[in-house]
Regions:
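Conserved alpha-helical segments that form or flank metal/cofactor-binding pockets of metalloenzymes
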Residues: 53-98
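Structured surface interface patches that mediate subunit assembly and partner/cofactor docking
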Residues: 2-21, 25-28, 35-48, 68-86, ...
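Long amphipathic alpha-helical segments that form oligomerization/scaffold cores
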Residues: 101, 105-109
């Protein structure tokens, strides 16, 4: 039997909360970008092969790609790749190669220029989704992902890359509503199961020994102040491992994306 949106219950992934979380991710990326001095765009990111300016360019490429996938759904190049049902590691390698090629082909631009183009494209994408929320976007094995479900993957992508930018600045980032991001992940990324802690009140021990595996930022095939509020997220000064123990759900998302071990 066909399963939709890859979760047992996706009631928390509904257009209102979903779009709020999505726009919060775009906004926090823009807010982080203005904190970079001109020479800071050469700072390393949690993806060792990328500087912050490269990450800005990657965001711009992804935002445009998501429009293409929606234009061509359910027969886009992404849909054809996902329809192979390949192992997640194989999918990640293929997407990483695609991302690297697109970044290499991107016209020269500064970090701020790439972020401005990203924001315009990402916000335009969000405007398109409500009208096609329940239409098929792509399929992975026995799971049909709708356009609304795909927004979940994109939403998670923005917040995870916000974390990457924050780490480049020596700061930490935690989204305002990680529960909604987890629902979006499950709606849009059936190939990457999300293992949440059984006891969500229990601190996540591994969060104090964060690692940044190579290529984790490029491989997700897309891969808010306090819960219930309307802020975009929390930024905290810190140069050590990300202090995520107060948000086990966010820690689980960072692990699922390869950013924490």
């Amino acid at each position: 039997m066909e399963r939709r949106d890859s979760g047992e219950s996706m009631s928390s992934w509904a257009p209102g909360r979903a779009l709020a979380a999505y726009h919060a991710g775009v906004t926090v990326i823009c807010e982080l970008a203005v904190r970079f001095a001109e020479d800071a765009w050469s700072a390393v990111t949690p993806c060792p092969e990328w500087r912050a300016a490269d990450l800005a360019g990657h965001l711009r490429c992804m935002a445009d790609d998501f429009h293409e996938y929606l234009d061509d759904a359910p027969d886009s190049r992404m849909a054809r790749l996902m329809a192979t049902g390949a192992h997640p590691d194989s999918l990640a390698r293929k997407m990483a190669r695609q991302n690297a090629a697109e970044l290499a082909a991107l016209p020269d631009g500064t970090g701020p220029e790439h972020i401005r183009a990203f924001a315009a494209s990402a916000r335009a994408y969000a405007q398109r989704i409500p009208a096609v929320w329940n239409l098929p976007h792509h399929r992975y094995r026995d799971t049909l992902v709708t356009a609304g479900g795909m927004l979940g993957a994109v939403c998670a992508e923005w917040h995870l890359h916000a974390w990457d930018l924050a780490r480049s600045l020596g700061k930490d980032y935690c989204p305002a509503d990680p529960d909604t991001l987890a629902a979006g992940w499950r709606a849009g990324l059936p190939q990457l199961p999300l293992d949440l802690p059984e006891d969500l009140d229990r601190p996540v021990a591994s969060s104090r020994t964060a690692r940044h595996p190579a290529a984790s930022c490029a491989a997700t095939p897309g891969t808010a102040a306090h819960r219930g509020g309307h802020g975009h997220g929390n930024l905290a000064v810190g140069v050590g491992p990300a202090p995520v123990e107060d948000s086990p759900v966010w820690a689980a998302l960072l692990r699922a994306s390869g950013r924490l071990l």
